[in-house]
Amino acid sequence: EAIPKKIAELRKSIPNAGDQFKDIKWHLTGKVIFQQESSEIFDRESFVILICSFALVLTLLFSIYRSFGSVVLLMTPLVGGIGLNYGFMYLICNEINPVVMGATGVLLGLGTEYAEHLWGRIREELDNGASHEEALTRTYAQTGPPVLLGALTGMLAFLSLCLSRQSALIQLGYLGASGLAFTLISTLFLVPALAVIAAKRPKDYFPRIRVSFEFIARSFKVHPAAVVIVSTAVILASLYYASGISYERDLFKVFLARNMESTTSSEIISQKFHSDFSKPIYLSFDVEDVQEGLMVQRELDGIIEKLMDKYHQIASFDSISYLMSPDAIRKENAKAFNGVVESWPTLEQTFKEGLRNSSLSKNAAHVMQEAFDATKGLFSSLDTDKPLQDKNGFADLECSWYMTKIKDKYRFLTHVRYADDIKDPQQLKEVDARIMKAVRQLPVPVRISGTRQAMEEILSDLVSELFRLGSYAFAAVVLIFLIIFPQPRGVALCLIPMVGAFCITLGVLGLTKLGLPFSIVCVAPLIFGFGIHNGMHIVMGSLFEDKGSIEKATRRVTPRAMVTSLTIIMGFVSMLSSRLYPLEFLGAAMVIGMVASVPLTLITLPAVLLLLERRKKGSAPETHVPVAPQ
């Protein structure tokens, strides 16, 4: 809280905040300002992303249902669930990470999904002649279990993020899970109440999908074997391209918003002075004795100076050496100084004789004599037995920038700034390696650190973190399904859309060479949790529902699956406009994953079910008539 307050004070005090110095434009820049401006951008974007997601979902629902009353029935449980979750956030969180805003977009899509499946089944039962009470009873008895199971898998997907080593993802995990829980509770309790209210109205307000998706519902019956072969080929090709994924090398792109005024000002200044002053690296070492540390620091300074002269990649550096010298060096300097003081009378006599014999005017000779006397006075005022002291204490403050005591040791810090043209991530690594190789000759180990190094350490294990959290989510989903489903075949069939969608997502990311930010670890759990929802309705309707069939279940689920998939996609689309790369990337990855899950759920999965059904029928014993020998 202190840093934003201090920055606000600086902005008020700089000249361009007032009426004076109108011709001078001042800028605040540097690492702290980068982070502050990026946070301010997030604060502005949070509300915009929420409103855009809400508007996109609302527009989509209105274009599909074409009834304001139907949209109100669908959105009311959603608004109730999100409102409860924001109240929960307010009670338990002091700060919200930008990535957590992804949970809001997810809730806008998934929260609508629960209501869409329930209202869609109610509409179907009413069209078949059932009463309102019968429609509600059958809906909750047959469609309710898949909705509950889908919500449970979504919550497990979010909760798996709590096993991450990154605090932002942990926060996203429990807030996303709580949001799904609140939205589910709101939906299950409000839909019956809203249905009773709608039934009493003279006009039919029960939601009815006005867009036909019949061509998709029939697609799986046309060459199902070819559908399975093509889907398998696409998934295998995606796995091949997925092998090329790697984390984003432009680390400041990952952690800071793009197109910021502070970074633009920093780049202009860096180009002007040929030094990337805002992103220094730090070389540090620990010693037990200050004098030993000062001697090592002088050696380190010499190594850096040689690297500067030889490679021209280091623009400048600062260390304690320009403020303090080792006692041994000071004694040598004092000895040389005392020699000058002792020989001063001889030097003064020689100077006066030379001045007398010169052809200088009296005025010029007088000026030179005054300068010589001033130099004598300066030497006389120096005390070589005591170090220079700053009466205002600023020297002590400045020394603390380069040397501090940590427990029983003293840590020395050297600030190193690279040239402004050293921007390529690989080139930066090479310069780091060259410095570390050069300092190996020092008697103490030297460490390298800085903002870039810290960012790189966070991102370096992204891929392993992705598969670790993904495996947790996968195992949790499979376990839940094995407990609920009466046979493993149903579990395997439900996994087809989510596993295929995840593989295709990674393949597209690898093919497009998109660098992975830390938000990538959300992708596997979310796709595993959400990609399975619609598949459950098809599998349960085909295999485990009374008088169910593949064609009947697919025809029933397809319209609702298309609407729910589109609403989930709309929840993520608004993130594509974000200036924060992790949010933008999460939106893009989830859109790819959800788009991929649609054909896998509505075409590939029914095709697999149809082939299994035909194989089962074809395996029945046949009667063979013996042929008489000729």
Q: Can you name each region flagged by the protein language model?
A:
Residues 1-15, 280-286, 400-435:
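A short beta-strand structural signal in non-transmembrane regions
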Residues 1, 30-35, 255-259, 284-293, ...:
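Structural beta->alpha junctions
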Residues 5-8, 12-255, 423, 430-433, ...:
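Membrane-embedded transmembrane helical bundles of large multi-pass transporters/channels
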Residues 1, 5, 37-40, 315-416:
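Extracytoplasmic
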Residues 273-278, 309-312, 395, 403-410, ...:
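A structural signal for short secondary-structure junctions
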Residues 217-218, 225, 243-289, 295, ...:
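Solvent-exposed, non-transmembrane loop/terminal regulatory segments of multi-pass membrane proteins
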Residues 267-272, 282, 302-307, 320, ...:
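Generic recognition of flexible, low-complexity loop/linker segments
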Residues 282-341:
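Soluble catalytic regions of membrane-associated enzymes that act on cell-envelope
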